[in-house]
Structure formats: structure tokens, C-alpha cells
Curated annotation (Swiss-Prot):
This is Flagellar basal body rod protein FlgB. It is found in: Bacterial flagellum basal body. It comes from Buchnera aphidicola subsp. Baizongia pistaciae (strain Bp). It holds the Pfam family Flg_bb_rod. The keyword Flavoprotein does not apply.
């Protein structure tokens, strides 16, 4: 029974991790807005999510390399840097020092944060529903 509950939350774990990863990239863009030569980057969210989700469905895990059976692997952790889909965006406005459109990156940062928060609320509601069912 716990396996079914765990599998049900797997997609949510993937989504939250991917939103958090994208948030780091967007924050880096904003922080480096005045850094000469810095290029704006982002991930192809749907492509990366598709890869992670299909790997999860196929049971593929992103394990650490272990040289002994006594070593601990990270088979439950999603290593997003393995799916580094960073691409340089083509911005219509580029400052003289770098290729960052700060307004677009700020909007994407807020939008991604809202999606992350919505996913957290959804997960909390799932937990509440499960607890209500278990209580009877």
C-alpha cells in the first residue's frame, strides 16, 4: 500500500525538484544582470520533465557510483544536473554588457515560484485527503 502512495507522489517530487532547479537558474540570471559577458540561460521545462518522468516510469534511478556493496547509493534522489538543458535565450533586448533581459527573467522567476507554490498546496491537499481516509 505504501508503494502506491509513494508512486503517487513521485510526479510531484519530480515537479518540485525541477521548479527548484529552474528557480536557481533564473536567480543566477537576475543576480548576474550586470555581469559583463554573462548570458541568460533557462531550461526546457517540458523536455526535461519528460525525460525525468519517463525515467521514473521505467524505473531508472540516478544512482551514485559505488565501489563496494557497503556504500550507500542515492537511488531516491533526482540529480537534475544530469539533465542540464540550459540554453541561451534569444532576447529581443540585450544590454551592451551581457545577453540578459532582466524583465523577462524576473517575470519567469515569479511565474516559476507561483507554480512551485501551487504544487506545494496540491501536495498538502493530497496528504490531507490521505490522512482523512486513514482516519475514517
Amino acid at each position: 500500500m505504501l508503494d502506491k502512495i509513494n508512486n503517487d507522489f513521485n510526479i510531484n517530487k519530480i515537479l518540485l525538484n525541477l521548479h527548484a532547479y529552474r528557480q536557481e537558474i533564473l536567480a543566477s540570471n537576475i543576480a548576474n544582470a550586470n555581469t559583463p559577458g554573462h548570458k541568460s540561460s533557462d531550461i526546457n521545462f517540458s523536455k526535461t520533465f519528460g525525460k525525468l518522468f519517463s525515467n521514473a516510469l521505467q524505473g531508472k534511478k540516478n544512482n551514485l557510483t559505488t565501489t563496494s556493496n557497503k556504500h550507500i547509493s542515492n537511488n531516491d534522489n533526482v540529480e537534475l544536473s544530469n539533465y542540464d538543458e540550459q540554453t541561451v535565450k534569444n532576447n529581443s533586448y540585450v544590454s551592451k554588457n551581457n545577453a540578459i533581459n532582466i524583465d523577462v527573467d524576473r517575470i519567469n522567476f515569479v511565474h516559476n515560484g507561483l507554480k512551485y507554490n501551487a504544487d506545494v498546496v496540491f501536495i498538502n491537499n493530497k496528504f490531507k485527503n490521505i490522512m482523512n481516509v486513514l482516519k475514517g
